[in-house]
């Protein structure tokens, strides 16, 4: 991308992917203009078809395309390699330890939801995640079946807000409400 900055662009479908790519740009000096897409599948397809130069995307739509040889994975975000792509280095191994980003999904309830209801929902969710069949299916889709208490999850969210605030400011990113 540095060799042809006039053609440097990247696909993104969410603030998470945009912020992660902008972090990579800030740490490497790489140029690139964001091209918006509606979803991860469209992002990967845009790279396969040569419409965009690169993307940072989640595992479910990406891993099958990498394994099929339709796109080349240069690195996985984070400090460790993915067990689904053991030959692909981590960002840390590639020389960018500060591009340690882990995407997560969460389950939210309305503010003021009674603690007993939250506990019931959490118990049911954890039972599903702990089911070996569900866990194996999630892992096969490149989804890490984690789990956190509401307090731990709040800490994760607050940490990410702190971690990425400078990226959003420096890259002058604007997101719709």
Model region roles, listed by residue range:
Residues 27-30, 67, 93, 115-177:
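An extracytoplasmic/periplasmic, membrane-proximal ligand-sensing/linker region
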Residues 62-131, 162, 176:
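C-terminal lobe and pocket-closing loops
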Residues 3-7, 50-51, 68-70, 94, ...:
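Structured helix-beta-strand junction loops
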Residues 7-88:
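Ligand-binding pocket segment of bilobal, Venus flytrap-like solute-binding proteins
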Residues 34, 53, 82, 109-112, ...:
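Short N-terminal micro-motifs specific to bacterial/archaeal maturation
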Residues 9, 33, 55, 74, ...:
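A local structural micro-motif
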Residues 1-42, 91, 104-137:
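Hinge/capping helix and adjacent helix->loop/strand transition within the periplasmic-binding protein
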């Amino acid at each position: 991308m540095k060799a042809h900055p006039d053609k440097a662009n990247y696909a993104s479908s969410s603030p998470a992917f945009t912020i992660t790519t902008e972090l990579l740009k800030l740490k490497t000096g790489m140029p690139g203009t964001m091209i918006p897409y509606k979803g991860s599948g469209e992002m990967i397809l845009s790279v396969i078809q040569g419409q965009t130069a690169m993307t940072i995307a989640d595992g479910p739509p990406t891993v099958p395309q990498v394994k099929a040889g339709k796109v080349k994975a240069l690195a996985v975000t984070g400090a460790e390699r993915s067990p689904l792509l053991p030959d692909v280095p981590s960002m840390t191994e590639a020389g960018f330890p500060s591009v340690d980003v882990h995407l997560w999904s969460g389950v939210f309830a309305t503010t003021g939801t009674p603690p007993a209801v939250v506990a019931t929902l959490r118990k049911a969710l954890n039972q599903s995640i702990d089911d070996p069949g569900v866990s194996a299916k999630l892992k096969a889709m490149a989804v890490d079946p984690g789990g956190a208490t509401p307090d731990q999850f709040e800490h994760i969210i607050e940490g990410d807000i702190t971690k990425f605030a400078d990226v959003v400011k420096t890259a002058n990113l604007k997101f719709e409400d």
